């Protein structure tokens, strides 16, 4: 009763992914977050599978992020899984996690499309003031070659990455409040 199978397996998968996120970059130079974290759709780093894989990744700078996410999953998810059943709970978990990813993409689109537009406008007008919100150390006499401009634009677009299943966890909290 304390660890229904879906909750137990989700916790195991999340812990294994967290450990892989720590060890693989050091041992094999494989950046799990870069590959499987959710990137902005306008970035070259975006892949559709990231809507699912990002839910199993967590901040590696401290174990606290992982612990509190998994504690919340266990604390509230176990009762929902027992009440709804395995399949309904798992569908709900993925639905809320993917939904949170879609909302994150919409927020990024609002933010990052402005940056992309500013870079494109600079390419045609050479008005450096357009880039001041996005780049530091610019003067009115700064000139950025087009090739470098495109590199900077991609760096900004690909810098946005999300990890963790906070959306799924908030969905579980909502469901818990409803039952």
Feature-to-residue mapping (PLM):
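A detector for small-residue-rich transmembrane helices and their helix-helix packing motifs
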Residues: 1-179
